[in-house]
């Protein structure tokens, strides 16, 4: 597992560095100045590695910050017919359900996965577990935690519920991923979250309507109910970890 982790992250970083160098060569003004063998220039590789590292850190937090400040907290302050803490948790709950099946982190085909599992013949199970574990721990739990606490407390949400949020997001994603794997074993139909079916889009529309439409008329889930659902989501994630 450790060897798979080292190779997979090295491969991902190499792919990202090469993508950065390729992008530099597509800039008209730089294209003529940069050497043809750009990928072999040590200095440019160091620079690209630094940029890749900075981008990895930013990707952990920047997207979450924008998510909370716009789609959850930013929109939430527009509603005046319900308590702000209830509105915050209500919107977050339904958006998390949408994200659980639209962005599982496990059924998203990417080029680095193709290189690793198809071209390099790496163990698909180990490779997937390494990257999925990284996504759950860092991109969700660590990435969500500071903003869940900050924006939640601004909306007067109790701290203990704020602390549940990242684990609820992670747990629900794990539960949906486990169900999708079970469904694949039963029906043999592989899921590609980049190509969702009509039913998935209809359900997404209904959930968005529930997230943003209901608070407009003063209808939101009470905080206790939302907190209970958060706990159920966490327990579902723990149970699905066996999958």
Language model features: what each stretch is:
Residues 1-114, 124-243:
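Hydrophobic alpha-helical transmembrane segments of membrane proteins
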């Amino acid at each position: 597992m450790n060897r798979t982790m080292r190779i997979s992250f090295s491969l991902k970083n190499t792919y990202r560095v090469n993508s950065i160098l390729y992008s530099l060569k597509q800039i008209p003004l730089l294209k003529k100045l940069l050497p043809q063998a750009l990928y072999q220039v040590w200095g440019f590789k160091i620079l690209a590695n630094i940029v890749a590292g900075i981008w990895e850190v930013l990707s952990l937090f920047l997207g979450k910050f924008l998510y909370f400040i716009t789609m959850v907290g930013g929109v939430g302050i527009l509603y005046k017919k319900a308590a702000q803490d209830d509105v915050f948790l209500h919107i977050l709950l339904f958006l998390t359900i949408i994200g659980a099946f639209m962005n599982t982190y496990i059924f998203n085909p990417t080029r680095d996965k193709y290189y690793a599992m198809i071209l390099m013949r790496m163990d698909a199970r180990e490779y997937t577990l390494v990257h999925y574990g990284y996504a759950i721990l860092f991109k969700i739990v660590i990435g969500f935690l500071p903003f869940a606490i900050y924006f939640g407390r601004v909306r007067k949400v109790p701290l203990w519920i704020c602390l549940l949020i990242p684990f609820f997001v992670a747990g629900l994603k794990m539960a949906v991923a486990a169900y999708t794997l079970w469904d694949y074993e039963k029906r043999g139909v592989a899921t590609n979250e980049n190509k969702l079916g009509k039913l998935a889009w209809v359900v997404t529309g209904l959930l968005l309507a529930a997230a943003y439409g209901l608070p407009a008329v003063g209808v939101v889930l009470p905080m206790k109910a939302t907190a209970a659902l958060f706990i159920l989501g966490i327990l579902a994630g723990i149970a699905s970890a066996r999958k």
